[in-house]
From Swiss-Prot:
This is Ribonuclease 3. Mg(2+) binds at residues 42, 115, 118. It comes from Shewanella baltica (strain OS185). Residues 156-226 form the DRBM domain. NCBIfam families: RNaseIII. Homodimer.
Length: 226
């Protein structure tokens, strides 16, 4: 297996440096590419993600009902959310895929991207411990946990846009940061969103990349309604 050329960049994006880099390599390996693939790590990561998010929601919402907690957890750990996280990390650029999956665009396939996120979580856990993994996940989910509320619709603009495109079997939206201004503690992000059905790109500007992406996605949804 060839080494992944941009692995240090991916580690910086993830916010975690692996002691055993082979664990990350395995987490990025689809079963179509090698016998030592990421499915067992995915199984582990799925369980860890569930307990970390469950614990965070339990303490964040002391008055929420079991039903509300379950719905919020489902929103945060479902495949659509994991796919969006994978896109934010640009995981498709790092995946090991077999020739067939590569040719068919597996690096964009939602299930493969979501599974890779769970596998990376499992890899981080094996490389460190549960508390290190918890701290990393809470960092990944900080904005989503800050925004989510019990008893209301949990779907944000990026999720709604993704579901709309999936319904028509269209490619996922492409988000690119085209400009960052300001000091590290007071930055403004400009993000461009492109989809197959629109000839022009749509721009979102906000104080974080994710917020800018949400603004751009909301504008695309409005254009699609016209």
């Amino acid at each position: 297996m060839e080494p992944i050329k941009n692995l240090p960049r991916l580690c910086r994006t993830l916010g975690y440096e692996f002691k055993n880099i082979e664990l990350l390599t395995q987490a990025l390996t689809h079963r179509s590419a090698a016998n030592k693939h990421n499915e067992r790590l995915e199984f582990l990561g799925d369980s860890i993600l569930s307990i970390v998010i469950s614990d965070a929601l339990y303490h964040q919402f002391p008055k929420a009902t079991e039903g509300d907690l379950s719905r919020m957890r489902a929103t945060l750990v479902r495949g659509d959310t994991l796919t969006i996280i994978a896109q934010e990390f640009k995981l498709g650029d790092y995946l090991y895929l077999g020739p067939g999956e590569l040719k068919s665009g597996g690096f964009r396939r939602e299930s493969i991207l979501a599974d890779a996120v769970e596998a990376i979580i499992g890899a981080v856990y094996l490389d460190s411990d549960l508390e290190v993994c918890r701290a990393l996940l809470l960092k990944w989910y900080a904005e989503r946990l800050a925004e989510i509320q019990p008893g209301i619709s949990q779907k944000d603009a990026k999720t709604l846009l993704q579901e709309h495109l999936q319904g028509f079997k269209k490619p996922l939206p492409d988000y690119q940061v085209i400009n960052i201004e300001g000091d590290a503690h007071d930055q403004t992000f400009t993000v461009e969103c492109r989809i197959e059905d629109l000839s022009q790109s749509v721009i979102g500007v906000a104080s974080s990349r994710r917020k800018a992406e949400q603004i751009a996605a909301a504008q695309v949804l409005e254009l699609l309604k016209k």
